[in-house]
């Protein structure tokens, strides 16, 4: 489900909803549900402060429905990208994306806003599945999986 709660950056919700479906299908989660809210920088800054104790907006936040322990167990599986955990078909969680921040990052990285938003959607879904980048080994694992999926999904 896509919910656009901001007005500063125009978004085409239907193509983004379809792309979310492609991400979930690629991960063998076609029946799973994810909600993505596009929020203002001000709202994202508040959430970033409340949930991560960091000042200012970030580009994406994920709020997994899976317990951390079960998500970690799934993320450590070698076949995690192609095998669904017990929760497949259920609600994976919520993702918040700040399009204004995404637009700044897109410009800085030479990408289109549409491409940046899709990359953030993928990144957020991986977090919902338990992947993380808090340690070097976690970062390496998540980056490998994300790069593989970016290629499969046609993202630069």
Spans of model-derived segments:
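An acidic/histidine-cluster motif and surrounding catalytic segment
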Residues: 1-118, 126-156
